[in-house]
Amino acid sequence: MILGVALVRPSPVLVAVRDGAPEWPVSRVAARAAARACVAVDLGDVPTAAVAAIRVGGPCPEVLRPRVGSGTATIVRGGHSLTGRVLAPLDTEAVRRFAATCGLTDFAVTATGSPMLADHELAVAATIAAEVPQARITLSYEFGHPGLREREQATIRNAALGPEAGRIADEAARELPGMPVFFARSGGGLVSAHYFRRYPLACDLGGTASLARGRVVLPGVPGEVAAAYGAAIGRPEAQVERIVQARGRAELDRVLQDARDEALTRVVSAGALPGSARIAETTVNPLSYLPDGLYRVRVTAEGAMP
């Protein structure tokens, strides 16, 4: 039996799935007999943490500075072009001072050019970790968007969701002791609780995605039931998005293989049985209005449940 859980107010809705057939309502005692639980939740209204945002790049007008709500932000010198050229040396001392004085533990780091070369983001993360050992750090290159503002906002959002995602995962573990728990992704599929804690942004609209999936199979049931069922019938999935530079077909094939290998590793981290991981989709698009040989690559991998 697989347990689908829709986290809705005032209380979660539980659906048991046996051989694809749904059963509800389900008592909490019966729920604990499930082989695994798959949770559907939207994170749009959950509490968010104050974030310390660091942008690595050149100066900009006030209106274009990072937007962090109740948090704080700084811009430090550094960054790369989308072709990997260093725009300026990284100001590590400015990073250290900001980390030491901001008073926060949730950090979002965005460097210009990091989808192509993440060296400065990784160096910033190392500096933060040395200064604030308990820091939770999100790096923008892991999200792959070519646009700085889009990538920066995704990074800040992921960092802001981190503490609440941890609380949700902890609560699920307490309610379902010893049971593997997965969370529904916004784009479909599932991720492990560990992955959910690290990349909650991937599950920002997990409830909505599960509802759409469940409605296809169960069009006449209440929305919460459809969402719980939609989560229960999912499978582990992960996506890698990168900006790559390739001069010629052979080099493009090589960087595509690197992206596929990373996607396969990531889907196993998301909970897939290692031997079952496979590439579900690869898209490659040239970037317009930029030097030849720059591509946006998106690879989706999926796998079976353990």
Regions found by a protein language model. Name each.
Residues 1-306:
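N-terminally biased helix-coil "hinge/interface" segments that flank
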